[in-house]
């Protein structure tokens, strides 16, 4: 069953396991939510854990939209291993929290946050993102993105890139190539590495 949910500590986690077709997953979400929607009051914010996030990145906006139909908001997307057996969970500091924006960034607009930033929308030319942690963009990136300003192990993940400048920690990179597929950008050996996901 690719879609399931669990209560853990004070959080509800929506788990999405490996799946073949997005349409089948969305139908399963409908079937499951129709059975349990009476448990939710329309104010819940849940965590989303998706297996093979890099491969399925382009599906995230449709998955979030489907869950939103049931008046449930995604407060964070878990991008690493979520250890539900851990005896204690370190309380997240304010500056480490993930913020989610559902908008397009227009020229002249800028968003900054000390933690991670998830943007469901496009970063247009002339706009800018500055994050202390990781930046995930479910859209095209044509503006300047600076990630890892407080955590050098952060990364940038986006559906496409055609931007003049990317930065992770203190490593800057001027692009001379356009990426039309999802791409994972990380720092290694003082350089930015680009892994295109095809």
Curated annotation (Swiss-Prot):
Q: What does this protein do?
A: Cell division inhibitor that blocks the formation of polar Z ring septums. Rapidly oscillates between the poles of the cell to destabilize FtsZ filaments that have formed before they mature into polar Z rings. Prevents FtsZ polymerization.
- Transcription: present as a keyword of the record? no
GO biological process per UniProt: cell morphogenesis; division septum assembly; regulation of cell septum assembly
Gene it is expressed from? minC
**Keywords assigned by UniProt, alphabetized:** Cell cycle, Cell division, Septation
- InterPro entries (UniProt xref): CAP/MinC_C (IPR016098), MinC (IPR013033), MinC_C_sf (IPR036145), Septum_form_inhib_MinC_C (IPR005526)
Q: What is this protein called?
A: Probable septum site-determining protein MinC
List, alphabetically, the Pfam families matched.
MinC_C
Q: Which Gene3D superfamilies match?
A: 2.160.20.70, Cell-division inhibitor MinC, N-terminal domain (3.30.750.50)
Q: Which family does it belong to?
A: Belongs to the MinC family.
Query: How does this polypeptide assemble, per the annotation?
Result: Interacts with MinD and FtsZ.
């Amino acid at each position: 069953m690719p879609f399931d949910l669990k209560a853990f500590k004070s959080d509800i986690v929506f788990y999405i396991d490996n799946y073949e077709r997005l349409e089948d997953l969305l139908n399963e979400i409908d079937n499951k939510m129709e059975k349990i929607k009476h448990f939710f009051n329309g104010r819940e914010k849940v965590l989303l854990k998706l297996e093979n996030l890099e491969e399925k990145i382009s599906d995230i906006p449709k998955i979030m939209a489907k869950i939103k139909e049931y008046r449930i908001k995604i407060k964070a997307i878990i991008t690493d291993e979520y250890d539900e057996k851990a005896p204690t969970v370190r309380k997240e500091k304010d500056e480490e929290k993930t913020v989610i924006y559902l908008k397009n960034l227009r020229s002249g607009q800028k968003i900054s946050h000390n933690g991670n930033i998830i943007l469901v929308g496009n970063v247009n030319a002339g706009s800018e993102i500055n994050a202390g942690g990781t930046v995930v963009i479910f859209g095209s990136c044509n503006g300047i993105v600076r990630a890892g300003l407080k955590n050098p192990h952060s990364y940038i993940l986006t559906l496409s890139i055609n931007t003049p400048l990317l930065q992770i920690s203190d490593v800057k990179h001027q692009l001379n190539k356009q990426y039309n597929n999802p791409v994972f950008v990380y720092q290694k050996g003082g350089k930015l590495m680009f892994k295109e996901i095809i």
